[in-house]
A protein has these predicted regions:
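Binuclear metal-ion centers of metallo-dependent hydrolases, dominated by the metallo-beta-lactamase
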Residues: 142, 155-183, 257-320
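N-terminal export signals
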Residues: 2, 11, 18-19, 24-43
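Active-site neighborhood of phospho(di)ester-bond hydrolases with catalytic His/Asp-centered motifs
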Residues: 73-74, 111-119, 144-147, 217-220, ...
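Active-site-proximal loop/helix segments of hydrolase catalytic cores
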Residues: 195-263
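Pre-active-site segment of Zn-dependent metallo-hydrolases
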Residues: 65-120, 125-147, 151-156, 197-201, ...
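Beta-strand-turn-beta hairpins that frame and shape the catalytic cleft
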Residues: 47-50, 64-71, 181-189, 210-216, ...
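Divalent metal-coordination and catalytic microenvironments
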Residues: 62, 118, 126, 189, ...
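C-terminal segment of N-terminal export signals and the immediately downstream linker at the start
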Residues: 39-63
């Protein structure tokens, strides 16, 4: 497979893609399975309180109540069309890189960590502008993503923006590969597989994220696959963010509900819908909630609109 450096604004999901081959996917699952021999993984300590803000599409923010560690999953904010899909006006703080950085600075976080699932424009489109804007405000900004993508695919772009990759990308610029871990200022990230494709050929990933006593599964863009059950057995996530938009690119509401059931999450939030004519509109959320009621009625489903913040308290779970 040929790997190429990429421009964050160049690729969109409706352009031709380089597919992550089945062979490589199976190898990735083998890595995940091998990680089960490493012993138990326990969630980070904390109160179980989490603020969640959905920015539209597949992009969302996690933070404890004091905003000490802010985690962004993917980086498509001021160019995000998710508000339009709901007929909503985008708030001023999400309208530009500078405005967003100002709003984050006002919250006085110890750090902001940007976790990248893959390089399609509706996830990666604002990445370098975001990192640069936060850095220019003297905010401690870090990032984590698939190791080869971070070290090879976008390495030159960091230099173009005047950024030091080794100081921004966790694990001294290496990122993480499947089954790998990165930890920083109270947040922990573990890479898990996603069945999707990328513009550059580097494999897409999802994340297990531990923050303030809550374990989050972020599916990224993916189809349903059998080893989601292994993710559940291995990591027992409390909260799952799953793509539900269907259409040409990802699983839809029914398969997303099955995914939540397989990973064993006690709470679920649907994302990646209503941001493009190619995916389902706002109705996808209700379709997902109905499917969850059939498949796993005890799972608490939170439906959100772009820009909204939900405050969740998730009781501690006993894990191996």
């Amino acid at each position: 497979m040929n790997h190429v450096a990429l421009d964050a604004n160049r690729f969109s999901e409706d352009q031709p893609m380089t597919h992550f081959t089945r062979r490589n996917f199976v190898a990735g699952l083998s890595l995940l399975a091998a990680s089960t021999a490493l012993g138990g993984v326990s969630a980070a300590e904390g109160t179980g309180d989490l603020k969640v803000r959905w920015y539209g599409g597949g992009v969302f923010e996690l933070a404890p109540p004091d905003d000490s560690t802010i985690v962004l999953v993917d980086a498509w904010i001021w160019n995000n069309t998710g508000f339009k899909g709901f007929g909503l006006q985008k708030p001023p703080e999400l309208s530009s890189a500078a405005a967003y950085a100002d709003s984050i600075k006002a919250r006085n976080p110890r750090t902001v960590i940007v976790a990248m699932t893959h390089d399609h424009g509706d996830h990666f489109g604002d990445y370098f502008e975001l990192i640069k804007a936060l850095s220019d405000k003297d905010i401690d900004v870090k990032s984590v993503g698939q190791s080869d993508f971070m070290r090879v695919g976008i390495k030159d772009k960091f230099t173009t923006y005047g950024l030091d990759e080794s100081k921004i990308v966790l694990n001294d610029g290496s990122g993480i590969n499947l089954g790998g871990t990165a930890t920083y200022k109270g947040a922990r990230f573990i890479a898990v597989p996603a069945v999707h494709s990328t513009a550059s050929g580097f494999p897409p990933i999802g994340f297990i994220i531990d923050l303030n006593g809550v374990r989050v599964y972020a599916s990224g863009d993916t189809d349903l696959y059998g080893d989601m059950a292994l993710i559940g057995k291995r990591y027992s996530p409390d909260l799952a963010f799953v793509c539900v938009g269907g259409g040409p690119f990802t699983m839809g509401p029914d398969d997303a509900a099955m995914a939540c059931s397989m990973v064993g999450a006690t709470n679920a939030i649907p994302v990646h819908y209503a941001h493009s004519p190619a995916v389902r509109g706002p109705e996808a959320a209700d379709q997902f909630k109905s499917a969850m009621a059939r498949l796993a009625p005890k799972v608490a489903v939170t439906l959100m609109k772009p820009g909204e913040t939900a405050r969740l308290h998730i009781a501690s779970r006993v894990r191996a």
